[in-house]
Amino acid sequence: MNMKNIFLGFLSQIRSILMIFSNIFSFRETRLYPDEPLNLSLRYRGRIILTRNSNGSERCVACNLCSAVCPVNCISLKKSEEKNGRWYAKSFQINLSRCIFCGLCEEACPTMAIQLTPDIELSEFKRKELLYKKKNLLFSGPGKFSKYDFYSISGVNTTYDLKKNLSKKISNCVDVTDLLP
């Protein structure tokens, strides 16, 4: 019985050595990251950017859907209004030290202003530098969706004269007090 245990121990040692030698010459799965670039898919959720339309205007309409859907509340924004009535984000900031890169903000954005790109180099030495403001997030191009324009698809006209058209609609209204018994 003792000899049997010694023989099985010897066989397991030989098997371990053979396994090591067979893996020495096989293809290595580990990539040396800084020297060899990683091949990330286009759907990889990395750096968050704010995109612009093809005409250069910001896509964000400050609807607050991104901050409402964020599970860790890392997005905060303040809205303001242009002269033509269009809303825009006066200030927009994302705390990347809290962000879990879930992509819910990208899915909730109706204008496709927020997009997650396959960029993974987000490390900083100080935690305060992970608070990205609007100037850090703005991207010069349209991002992944170059042909998407929210205002042409939704049919919203920002040059609508409310006072002029409201007076026309009021004059066509029926006085409901005449219908009462």
UniProtKB/Swiss-Prot annotation:
Bilayer topology annotation: Peripheral membrane protein
Catalytic activity from the UniProt record: a quinone + NADH + 5 H(+)(in) = a quinol + NAD(+) + 4 H(+)(out)
Positions of the 4Fe-4S ferredoxin-type domain: 51-80, 90-119
Pfam families named in the record: Fer4_7
GO molecular function: 4 iron, 4 sulfur cluster binding; iron ion binding; NADH:ubiquinone reductase (non-electrogenic) activity; quinone binding
Cellular localization per UniProt: Cell membrane
Positions that bind [4Fe-4S] cluster 2: 70, 99, 102, 105
Gene Ontology biological process terms in this record: aerobic respiration
Signal peptide bounds: none
Cofactor(s) of this protein: [4Fe-4S] cluster
Similarity comment: family membership: Belongs to the complex I 23 kDa subunit family.
HAMAP family, A to Z: NDH1_NuoI (MF_01351)
Job description of the protein: NDH-1 shuttles electrons from NADH, via FMN and iron-sulfur (Fe-S) centers, to quinones in the respiratory chain. The immediate electron acceptor for the enzyme in this species is believed to be ubiquinone. Couples the redox reaction to proton translocation (for every two electrons transferred, four hydrogen ions are translocated across the cytoplasmic membrane), and thus conserves the redox energy in a proton gradient.
Protein name, as recorded: NADH-quinone oxidoreductase subunit I
